[in-house]
Regions:
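N-terminal accessory segment at the very beginning of proteins
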Residues: 1-238, 243
Length: 243
């Protein structure tokens, strides 16, 4: 079972070998970090900007579940560590967990597949996989620039790495009213299947992702750029420059 605590407005969950930290990070947004290491890494990665939030943590009586709310978005964690996200109290994203006790999915719970998987490497890092339930009717957009004639990414598998003619920006916007950043600088893969969604990091010391919920894609992107930074306005001195 998991033990829940609150630390400076963040929801902390400790299991036997994993630490989960969920905290407000900007407007209507949450940052989720989990690790098997004794100390949670403090790297900001892409979340470079100082942003305010109004997150509030509630731990249920008896300590079996907990939640954190920041504006329009809410995250809940149950006794085995399954994280669910809600926009205005409507479920928008749920971790995939099929491992008997504690499972909350409607389909089979006997696959022995956990939401977050850490495979040890010859270092303090892991190959990390995070799984989410998939809505086959969902539409997904973003992820940078890939050489393919596909707008809706549902059903696509995308390598997360920079290549000649490919720019990977692991931020995706859903028509269900949320945007998610895979906040990890390592190479990896994003698989947006109709039956399961997977984010994979080839080598990392923690799970790290950021999620926001809002009413329009423009508001979602605004929340995102508030946290990762915005390009400065070009000086008029450079307008009309020919090279």
């Amino acid at each position: 079972m998991i033990r829940f605590t609150e630390e400076n407005g963040a929801l902390i969950a400790h299991s036997r070998n994993e630490t989960i930290r969920i905290e407000g990070w900007g407007n209507n947004a949450l940052r989720v970090r989990t690790t098997l290491l004794k100390k949670l890494p403090q790297d900001a990665h892409a979340l470079t900007e100082n942003v305010a939030h109004s997150a509030k943590v509630t731990i249920a009586e008896g300590g079996e579940t907990a939640e954190i709310v920041n504006g329009k978005i809410k995250a809940t964690v149950n006794g085995v560590g399954i994280i669910c996200f809600y926009k205005d109290n409507e479920l928008i994203l749920q971790e995939y967990y099929s491992y008997y006790y504690g499972s909350i999915r409607k389909e089979a719970i006997c696959y022995k597949i956990r939401s977050r998987e850490y495979k040890g490497l010859a270092s303090d890092d892991f190959k990390i996989t995070v799984r989410f339930e998939s809505d086959p009717k969902e539409k997904l957009f973003g992820m940078g620039q890939y050489q393919m004639p596909i707008l809706d990414l549902k059903g696509s598998v995308l390598p997360i790495e920079q290549r000649n003619s490919q720019v990977s920006v692991p931020f995706v916007v859903s028509n269900k009213g949320y945007g998610m950043l895979w906040n990890n600088p390592s190479t990896g893969e994003a698989a947006f299947g109709t039956n399961i969604t997977k984010w994979i990091s080839d080598e990392s010391d923690m799970v790290d992702y950021w999620i926001t919920a809002d009413d329009t894609p423009a508001q979602i992107v605004t929340n995102y750029t508030e946290c990762v930074g915005r390009a400065p306005v070009m000086s008029k001195d450079y307008l009309g420059l020919w090279q």
